[in-house]
């Protein structure tokens, strides 16, 4: 079952990081652990040697301990199956997956990288609803990073720089659309700060120039003009 789920995630999002995240989810680990223990107990129940000792009132429970434990873990495994089905559903619905990835306040670096891969997959699929949420999350994230950093040099995390370059590359490669939230240079302009008054870091300059060079290579000169207008 899990092999099929992994294949489905790979086909839908083309993301190895999302597969790794799925396998590292608490529900997945609990399911695999309970499954292994339950299989072991069921097998042990068949080959367990008889008890020849008398433990008084506990003897009856010890005699049937393998059956009792196997029953308990079968019940736990049943609950775990429902949890893993819920997780599979989340990973198959992009809107829910996007919210699932950013639900924590302290989002790990690997999760952020996986989130950018989801962002790129939604660009390829032109899923406007999820893209709108992704743009908003990127804006909120950069705003939160700059909070309380007034008049100080603001360096963003490496995964943000890498993610913006990757998303910008995908945007440049796609066909132009008459009306689209993907038009314009919002993905680059999000690093510009005209409200919180932070000072731009050298890595931010470098990332912006990389994105502008990508746009120049793919003949998106109108985006470059929009950037200079915003800058």
Name what the model sees in each region:
Residues 1-51, 78-88:
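Transmembrane alpha-helix detector for multi-pass membrane proteins
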